[in-house]
Amino acid sequence: MAVPKRRMSRANTRSRRAQWKAEATGLVSVTVAGQPRKVPRRLLKAARLGLVDLDRR
């Protein structure tokens, strides 16, 4: 495991941490039972097979 050689300043630490941002999940269109829906790509196959309840909020 990497170990820092010197102490990192608070300003440098906070500016580095500020680069990490959450991203919205990319939605793709899928037609289920004749109705167009938008689901995350990782749930696309499950939505097509009917394993995911898309009517639930």
UniProtKB/Swiss-Prot annotation:
Pfam families assigned: Ribosomal_L32p
CC annotations in GO: large ribosomal subunit
Similarity annotation: Belongs to the bacterial ribosomal protein bL32 family.
HAMAP family given in the database record: Ribosomal_bL32
Keywords tagged on the record: Ribonucleoprotein, Ribosomal protein
SUPFAM superfamilies hit by this protein: Zn-binding ribosomal proteins
Protein name: Large ribosomal subunit protein bL32
An example Gene Ontology biological process: translation
GO molecular function: structural constituent of ribosome
Covalent S-S links between cysteines: none
InterPro entries: Ribosomal_bL32 (IPR002677), Ribosomal_zn-bd (IPR011332)
Organism: Mycolicibacterium gilvum (strain PYR-GCK) (Mycobacterium gilvum (strain PYR-GCK))
